[in-house]
Swiss-Prot record:
It is an enzyme of class 1 (oxidoreductase). It is found in: Secreted. It comes from Margaritifera margaritifera (Freshwater pearl mussel). Residues 1-22 form the signal peptide. Cu cation A binds at H145, H154, H163. The keyword Secreted applies. This is Tyrosinase-like protein 2. It comes from the Eukaryota. Its main location: secreted. It holds the Pfam family Tyrosinase.
């Protein structure tokens, strides 16, 4: 069988798997069970009081879902349940307290962390991954982002809330190792402002930060990072930063999201919404500004494992990137409040009409409803963000204060020796084609991320 025929069969099989999964997820009886599970988890009996038969049935159905959809073992399901119990206790305490927490962990830009803070965080992430206990906790959390979540947590309104909850679980897992760690965010507008010719020389892809930008990652805290068998063609974490393929988060898009008074409801910044602001690049190509679309560009820019849905969270850069996406969303929510809009109730419902419905239980976090991801609970009781300032950037060895009081990344200067790892073959499933400056999805399951524009 020739290569093209084989590829066609792979794409057809992936499409059929995706359709079958959607049919399973939208089964009315299953949805009733999921709703019961969410209700039961919110009102679990205290002490030795037995759960109701309906709740026992719902818990068993949830465990079966996690086994069938994510292929989790009993140990992995129990681990995730333990994280759910921790987050549930946080929510119960929040309801009793009903006051905003005074001292919250602060998520900062990664380059503005102190040396101690950065090394502490990176070491903790490595410890989570390299732990040899059963199950591997990092891999279990990464597997929550496998192909099954595609129609539920991407391409629609639930993208923002689902990933906010996902980050919270990841951060809770890290704090089990070191209670004083807090995630940082990677503000790629700082790298965008270097100019396209210099993007690949950003100093975050060095041994002090994320490691090398191309090939197998052999430098930095995430070097020699094993990938689960069969996930990619590589046994270890790899990247493939290539000019003209993806881009950092456009600082013009960020400015529009933060300040444009014409985009003050979620529909104007979410996938499949309306009323978008636009950007026109130097080739005259125009694209809509959405948070998810700009996010996709960064996945393509980093490349390698980050470029595909299933292995993306295996690169720790995934979580720093998504922490920035969450920061961008919170800045947008602040703008909404300035214009007397309530971000907790403004749920647009774009995307798959069932899976992105406001009251549909979140896949993987099924005691949350989708709209719960839009709650103010997180920013009031779990963490807060600290915006980069020129004063802080001035004192960091990794940033400078540029024109217009904008923080700009420092570079590994062109022409200097930048270590690169062994090259890794492309994934056997081709996920993109390029037409007119736009990357188009050509596979449903195991897909890559759509880039709204690959040229500037």
């Amino acid at each position: 069988m020739n290569t093209m025929a084989l590829f066609g069969k792979v794409i057809l099989l992936q499409f059929l798997i995706g359709v079958g999964f959607c049919m399973l997820m939208q089964d009315p009886k299953r949805n009733d069970t999921k709703s019961t599970y969410a209700t039961c988890f919110r009102s679990q009996p205290q002490g030795n009081e037995p759960a109701s038969p309906d709740c026992v049935k719902a818990f068993m159905a949830y465990a079966e879902d996690m086994k069938n959809i994510f292929h989790f073992t009993k140990e992995q399901i129990n681990y995730l349940w333990s994280l759910e119990r921790e987050t549930q206790s946080l929510f119960h305490n929040h309801r009793r307290r009903k006051r905003q927490a005074v001292f919250l962990p602060v998520r900062k830009e990664c380059r503005l962390l102190s040396e101690f803070e950065r090394q502490n965080l990176f070491y903790t992430i490595r410890s989570l991954k390299m732990d040899t206990s059963n199950p591997n906790e990092y891999d279990t959390l990464a597997n929550l982002h496998r192909g099954a979540v595609q129609p539920h947590a991407h391409d629609g309104s639930n993208f923002l809330g689902w990933h906010r909850v996902y980050l919270m679980y990841y951060e809770r897992a890290l704090r089990r190792i070191r209670g004083d760690v807090t995630l940082c965010f990677w503000d790629t507008t700082m790298d965008f402002n270097l100019g396209m010719d210099n993007w690949e020389y950003t100093a975050v892809f060095s041994s002090d930060f994320f490691g090398n930008r191309r090939g197998q990652v052999i430098t930095g805290p995430f070097r020699d990072w094993p990938l689960p068998p069969g996930l990619t063609e590589s046994d270890y974490l790899y990247r493939n930063m290539t000019r003209g393929r993806g881009m950092p988060f456009d600082s013009r898009a960020a400015s529009s999201i933060f300040y444009n008074p014409n985009t003050i409801i979620h529909s104007t910044v979410t996938w499949e919404g309306f009323g978008f602001d636009t950007i026109t690049n130097s080739q005259g190509q125009t694209r809509n500004i959405t948070i998810e679309g700009e996010h996709n560009n960064v996945h393509n820019w980093v490349g390698g494992a980050m470029e595909f849905l299933d292995p993306a969270p295996q690169d720790p850069v995934f979580f720093f990137h998504h922490c920035y996406i969450d920061y961008v969303w919170e800045r947008f929510r602040e703008k909404m409040r300035r214009y007397f809009r309530d971000p907790t109730t403004d749920y647009p419902g774009h995307g798959n009409e069932t899976l992105h419905d406001a009251n549909y239980p979140m896949i993987g976090f099924e005691w949350f409803r989708n709209i719960d991801g839009y709650s103010d609970y997180f920013i009031q009781n779990v963490y807060r963000y600290e915006s980069p300032t020129c004063q802080a950037c001035y004192y960091s060895p990794y940033t400078v204060c540029g024109q217009g009081n904008q923080c700009i990344a420092r570079m590994n200067y062109p022409g200097t020796e930048i270590e690169e790892g062994p090259q890794v073959p492309n994934s056997p499933v081709v996920a993109f084609s390029v037409a007119g400056g736009t990357m188009l999805m050509s596979a449903f399951n195991g897909r890559g991320f759509i880039a709204t524009s690959n040229s500037e």
